[in-house]
From Swiss-Prot:
Pfam short name (any one): Ribosomal_L14
Superkingdom assignment: Bacteria
Organism: Rhodospirillum centenum (strain ATCC 51521 / SW)
GO biological process: translation
Assigned GO CC terms: cytosolic large ribosomal subunit
NCBIfam families in the record: rplN_bact
CDD domains for the chain: Ribosomal_uL14 (cd00337)
Keywords noted in UniProt: Ribonucleoprotein, Ribosomal protein, RNA-binding, rRNA-binding
Complex formation: Part of the 50S ribosomal subunit. Forms a cluster with proteins L3 and L19. In the 70S ribosome, L14 and L19 interact and together make contacts with the 16S rRNA in bridges B5 and B8.
InterPro entries from the UniProt entry: Ribosomal_uL14, Ribosomal_uL14_bac-type, Ribosomal_uL14_CS, Ribosomal_uL14_sf
Protein name: Large ribosomal subunit protein uL14
Keyword field contains Lyase: no
Protein family (similarity comment): Belongs to the universal ribosomal protein uL14 family.
Functional description taken from the UniProt entry: Binds to 23S rRNA. Forms part of two intersubunit bridges in the 70S ribosome.
Amino acid sequence: MIQMQTNLEVADNSGARRVQCIKVLGGAGRRFASVGDIIVVSVKEAIPRGRVKKGDVHRAVIVRTAKEIRREDGSCIRFDRNAAVLINKQGEPIGTRIFGPVTRELRAKKYMKIISLAPEVL
């Protein structure tokens, strides 16, 4: 469950290390976002010579949350930290690699590029 001011780690090699959610997209007054939702983020920490710089504003799709996700079969899945992948306006990832596992829920939201780059889909 991600809301405004939430800090997330970046799960790709775009150059950002840590981002902060500044807006949850999808409807007026929408407060929370979960796995597969798009948010607007500000880069708070970045590596030198990366594709993105500190202070840049980008869109991101959430790939892991600390709040558990209920599945249709009744099972739950949760992670230690919140993580996101930076995307451009067309919905394609800015980075070329994804670090760590991603959830199956991304397949239903049509993020096939992120799923194909991920080392593990849970």
